[in-house]
Amino acid sequence: MEVPLQKSAPGSALSPARVLGGIQRPRHLSVFEFESDGFLGSPEPTASSSPVTTLTQTMHNLAGLGSEPPKAQVGSLSFQNRLADLSLSRRTSECSLSSESSESSDAGLCMDSPSPVDPQMAERTFEQAIQAASRVIQNEQFTIKRFRSLPVRLLEHSPVLQSITNSRALDSWRKTEAGYRAAANSPGEDKENDGYIFKMPQELPHSSSAQALAEWVSRRQAFTQRPSSAPDLMCLTTEWKMEVEELSPVAQSSSLTPVERASEEDDGFVDILESDLKDDEKVPAGMENLISAPLVKKLDKEEEQDLIMFSKCQRLFRSPSMPCSVIRPILKRLERPQDRDVPVQSKRRKSVTPLEEQQLEEPKARVFRSKSLCHEIENILDSDHRGLIGDYSKAFLLQTVDGKHQDLKYISPETMVALLTGKFSNIVEKFVIVDCRYPYEYEGGHIKNAVNLPLERDAETFLLQRPIMPCSLDKRIILIFHCEFSSERGPRMCRFIRERDRAANDYPSLYYPEMYILKGGYKEFFPQHPNFCEPQDYRPMNHEAFRDELRNFRLKTRSWAGERSRRELCSRLQDQ
């Protein structure tokens, strides 16, 4: 059984025109056509049923809000019938729930029912709220994407477009638009159409394809006459500048009225594309010139004489719209003198300072490097000194060979023979052959003019206490050490003399800067050159007849070595 709907008060909670937080409900839904029977959200009277039953019936009636709006009275009747079916089905499903909660509802423990609402008053209030919301939306300005770079209202304020003669069209268009808005907001208009915002755009009349193609070809030909590079812009005359300004997209966009803009944005562009596909083989003459013509325009001789040359940097970074007269030329004189044979006489300016002051000015003193050997020593140390003698002043005179010790220089027996025969007499003032063997070995056979110095103290006394000095700086003093094999005693004696020589002189000066070792010793020299030995014999160190002498000289050598080490230790302690 249907319960009759009662009218709801306009200020009730379920009234559509109720304002939440002071904001009116915007018009986002189409207006429903309500019947006089009642409003969809109006509740049932509380006297005939319990509050829970009333709330259930109210929810059944509200279920129709999600359905499609009716378009005629017949649709509204079917809509009410559908609501009745829904309410019956839901009542049967929830009868058990209402019976169980009857006791609590009678006790007054449920929600209060909303007050009744008048359907006609609710419909009128809802329409007024939607109309007010539509006026707010119409007054707001939305940012719409434009195809032009300048907005419509700012076109007449642009300094570039101040000389446009069609600004009146803009004013008339603005007035027309204002008239449309005033007519739309007038109170005498129908309320149903007053809230309407969006309208279907009307199609613009398309121009014929032949007319659009002709206009497109004329624009292409005009574009081909424009300068194609920065050098062409520099050579423009006054007439060319006017033509370029007319062809500028800014000027073209400013010279169009809003009505022309709308027609130009959609003035048969699709038709032009279709005609391009049909006439693809027919290329306009302007396009052929654009493809085949050179980028740089060739000037005549008369135009070249009138042209002012500018620096490359200024031409590269200059704006194309910048006039040529602003940039200064490189040369103040545009034409150089033709007669270069005759010197150009320039006037010499008189000096401001008097001659007396010029004469009193003293010349600036030049700074010279102080005389020092440090620079030379650094150069010597930085260079490869392995090919130089001990004081790094000269290279080795004799030809050297590889030996057992890499820090010493070795010579062959043939080089020794050349030295004995006097082949280096013009350079070598004196050479000393130091025989480091024991005395019984020396007496058994030795090289001619050799000196026997078996002990280190004997060598130090003979060579360093009274050093041999050359008579001239061009001459050299050479020392040659050897023993039986030139493997132990000869190299040790050579190092000892160099060590004492370094201690006795300031670095890098030496008494004997050039010293050699005879490779192979006396054992290798005697079989090859016995004529340069006296006596012509060879006595080895381990000879059975001289074992006692060998033992004595070894003890002396060890004691001398021990005394030397003790003396060195004492000297180091004294220095500390």
From Swiss-Prot:
Residues 90-105 have a biased composition (Low complexity). Tyrosine protein phosphatase which functions as a dosage-dependent inducer of mitotic progression. Directly dephosphorylates CDK1 and stimulates its kinase activity. Required for G2/M phases of the cell cycle progression and abscission during cytokinesis in a ECT2-dependent manner. The three isoforms seem to have a different level of activity. The active site is at C483. Keywords: Cell cycle, Cell division, Cytoplasm, Cytoskeleton, Hydrolase, Mitosis, Phosphoprotein, Protein phosphatase. It catalyses: O-phospho-L-tyrosyl-[protein] + H2O = L-tyrosyl-[protein] + phosphate. Residues 427-534 form the Rhodanese domain. PANTHER family: M-PHASE INDUCER PHOSPHATASE 2 (PTHR10828:SF48), M-PHASE INDUCER PHOSPHATASE DUAL SPECIFICITY PHOSPHATASE CDC25 (PTHR10828). GO terms for cellular component: centrosome; cytoplasm; nucleus; spindle pole. Its EC number is 3.1.3.48. Coiled coil: none annotated. Expressed predominantly in spleen, lung, heart, brain, intestine, and muscle. One of its GO terms (biological process) is positive regulation of G2/M transition of mitotic cell cycle. Phosphorylated by BRSK1 in vitro. Phosphorylated by CHEK1, which inhibits the activity of this protein. Phosphorylation at Ser-351 by AURKA might locally participate in the control of the onset of mitosis. Phosphorylation by MELK at Ser-167 promotes localization to the centrosome and the spindle poles during mitosis. Phosphorylation at Ser-321 and Ser-372 by MAPK14 is required for binding to 14-3-3 proteins. It comes from Mus musculus (Mouse). Gene3D superfamilies: Rhodanese-like domain (3.40.250.10). It is an enzyme of class 3 (hydrolase). This is M-phase inducer phosphatase 2. Belongs to the MPI phosphatase family. Interacts with MAPK14 and 14-3-3 proteins. Stimulated by B-type cyclins. One of its GO terms (molecular function) is protein kinase binding. The keyword Secreted does not apply. Residues 90-119, 338-358 are annotated as: Disordered. It is found in: Cytoplasm, Cytoskeleton, Microtubule organizing center, Centrosome; Cytoplasm, Cytoskeleton, Spindle pole.
